[in-house]
Every structure is written in C-alpha cells, then in structure tokens.
Regions:
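Sec-dependent N-terminal signal peptides
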Residues: 4-13
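Positively charged n-region of N-terminal signal peptides that target proteins for export
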Residues: 1-4, 19
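C-terminal segment of classical bacterial N-terminal signal peptides
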Residues: 14-21
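N-terminal, motif-rich segments that launch catalysis or mediate targeting to/interaction with membranes
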Residues: 23-164, 171-293
Length: 293
C-alpha cells in the first residue's frame, strides 16, 4: 500500500504546489474530474474507495496512469502512416505478453459517423483505441470481485477507471472514424507560436487565463442541478462516450492543420471545456456508485 500512497501523494503535491504543464487533460484537468467525482460519490462507494485506497482520493490518483504510460496504457497506430487510409487497417494483431507487461488500455475512444462508440477494441478484425471498452471491463471486474483482487491490481483498476473516464471526455482523445482520425495532432498557431490542438486541450486552455488549483477548478465546473446530473449519468459507459463525442465535435471540427487560433479561442471553447469536465466527474462517480452500491 505504500506504493499507492507515494505515487498518489507525489501527483497530488505537484498539483497543489505547481501549475499544469502538459499531459492528457493535464494533471489539473484529470484531478478536477476526480474531485468532482469525489464530491458525488454515494456513502457506500466513498467508504469502499476510502478502504481500498487507504484514504487517498480519486483526485489524487487521477494521473497515476500517466506515470505508467507504456505499461498500464498503450495507444496503437494512433497516427496512420498513410494519411489516405483509416488507421484501423494498420494494426490487426498485437502480442501483449511482453517483458514490459504492457496492457492494451487505450487513452482514446473511437466512434462512428453517428457518434456511436464501439463496444469492442476490434473493428472488423483490426484493433481500435477504445477506452470505454476497457472501463467497462475493469468496472465489471471490480463489481464482481473487488474484495478478492490483489491489492495492487485493485488499485490499478480503480486508477485506470479514473484516468480513462477523464480521457474519454477530452475532445482530442476522441477518434471520429473514418472522417477525422488524427485531428488532435494537427499543428496550429497560438499566440504566434506553433502548437498542436492536442496540446491546447491537454493544458493550454487551463493555463491561458486561469491560475487555479484543481479544487477551485472543480468548483467552477460543478454547477449542474440534481435533475441535470441524473440526465447526464443516464445510460452506460458507451452512452457516455457517444455523448462525449457528440458534445466535443464542435471543438474538434472548428480548426484544422495550419489554422491560426483566434485570441477568443479560450473563451469560445470554455463551454465545451467546462461541460466535459463536469460530465466526466459526474459519470465517474456514477460508475463507482454502481460498482460499490
């Protein structure tokens, strides 16, 4: 259990003492989602997570998966070598029994032209990135045998759910198949400098005008009524992923490679940013409530 505490406290301390620099949603974004979820856990779920994590919060472990990138998580074929083709055709099989103990938990979700999330990581025989599929499997495992699991594997499952639910609500972690497979990696101009849309959503949108800690950020976004939260948390993980993709599309399609982002980009995207963070938090809480209630 010391390993869990040390990893999580390190991530949490970095958030409290410093500012977000980069990485999926950024540590600030992930911990914001975790904090919103912590606030909306049922008493039973809160008690179970408190026991299993030795009192460490979801906000604190929200970026632990990034500490094990390449071991816990792996996105395959994210950028196709042939820009004319969909990336799913380039990876058909992969052997995960490697010395590094790599697990195929993807940071991204893949949806079709109707924003429907695939309930699999295999599309017509080809691997696709699908964090929702892995969250579904991890949640089922925890619900079935959380008490029987190895301590570290249980922590890993909880931490992965927290992180992957966060990732699937980030617009640049959504693959729109087949029309927009690599948009997040498009280079754009922001304040006279070249950056990527992915980098904007992984941190720059938070730090452009804000100097918040994750607690402050969570309070900014956690504004839905109980009725709205019930609506947001309807359905299952695939419904959540589809809704996330639908809500994110305006942000994804607004600008492309070579575009100069306007000075108003941060405020233009703020409604999407805030709604995705709050929805991710509410849904993360709903997943754990369903597992442990």
């Amino acid at each position: 259990m010391k390993r869990i505490i040390l990893i999580s406290l390190f991530a949490c301390a970095a958030l409290l003492l410093g500012r977000t620099e980069a990485s999926a949603w950024g540590k600030l974004g992930h911990s914001t989602i975790g904090y919103v979820a912590d606030t909306h856990l049922s008493p039973k779920a809160k008690a179970a997570l408190h026991e299993y994590l030795d009192g460490v919060t979801l906000a604190a472990i929200a970026s632990d998966a990034d500490l094990f990138r390449g071991q816990w998580t792996l996105d395959l074929g994210f950028v196709p070598t042939n820009p004319e083709a969909s990336r799913v055709s380039f990876v058909t099989t992969f052997d995960f029994t490697t010395p590094l103990n790599i697990s195929p938990y993807s940071h991204s979700i893949t949806v079709d032209e109707n924003y429907k999330c695939y309930p699999t990581d295999n599309l017509d025989g080809a691997y696709i990135n699908n964090a929702a599929y892995y969250v579904d499997r991890l949640a089922a495992e925890l619900k079935e045998k959380a008490d029987e699991m190895d301590e570290y594997e249980r922590y890993k499952a909880i931490a992965l759910i927290v992180h992957l639910v966060g990732d699937m609500h980030c617009p640049m972690h959504i693959v729109y198949n087949p029309v927009n497979t690599i948009k997040g990696h498009a280079d754009v101009i922001w304040k006279g400098k070249e950056t990527s849309l992915h980098s904007m959503w992984d941190g720059k949108l938070f730090t452009a005008y804000y100097d918040w800690g994750f607690v402050d950020m969570a309070k900014l976004v956690d504004t839905a009524t109980k009725k709205q939260i019930r609506e947001i948390t309807k359905g299952n993980i695939y419904d959540y992923a589809s809704d996330s993709a639908r809500n994110s599309w305006p942000a994804v399609c607004a600008y492309g490679a070579g575009d100069t982002l306007p000075a108003s980009y941060v405020t233009d995207m703020r409604p999407v940013l805030f709604s995705q963070l709050r929805n991710g938090g509410y849904r993360l809480a709903a997943i754990f409530n369903e597992i442990f209630d």
